[in-house]
């Protein structure tokens, strides 16, 4: 069924094998070259129809500007331009309700209908939180791809950073609860999804920099000292006295491609997905 741009069609039904008739909202125009689609249901019980289509990459603005992005927990993305971007989450009341439901779930009897209802309510709230995070990553990645020709990020291994600290029975982990809380905040900040969407929207324009010492190096004079970062938010160079936001300082080092190897030498930014974009190919 075709759908015009800007049209919002409600009440469409689709028959899913072994599930019956499911209603869905057709809220956007479907590309003409779509040949397949997939119907899924998430843990919150919501049905989704996903159409397989590859969007065109966003062309660079051609201004030659380079931006560095420092991703963190307190600040989701600090730009070398001085901007501090924070990924939003659930509103305060919904966060409180989520915590109440989680406590109720811990008290509920396993296998009971009440426990199933609480789990569904928790899944709906967490699904809403994930939707907010995805929406922020989509809008932020689109803005960055439109504004800058080159985007540099740290080469972070999110899977290793969020690995469980429980350990084994023979060698139990330490500070397990604190590490679990940190893992949740890292995943909630959307740092991995943001970079993946940048790769998709700006192929050939995303570069990765070694993360070593980007937070301890002064972006003004290049001096490296652990004591220069006085707090999570404040960086004051022990050599030149340069003072600025610590995350912005790290982002400027990333933008310049400045990293330090284990032997003390300069790290080099390495390109990722450096295929030429069709819009940048020379005309014959």
What are these regions (language model features)?
Residues 1-14:
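Hydrophobic alpha-helical hairpins/lids featuring a short glycine-rich hinge
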Residues 10, 17-20, 32:
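"…together with the soluble PPM/PP2C metallo-phosphatase catalytic core" -> "…together
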Residues 14, 21, 45-48:
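Trp/Tyr-centric glycan-recognition "aromatic platform" motifs on solvent-exposed beta-strand/loop surfaces
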Residues 20-28:
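Beta-strand/loop nucleic-acid-binding surfaces
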Residues 28-35, 41-284:
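Positively charged, helix-rich recognition surfaces that bind polyanionic ligands
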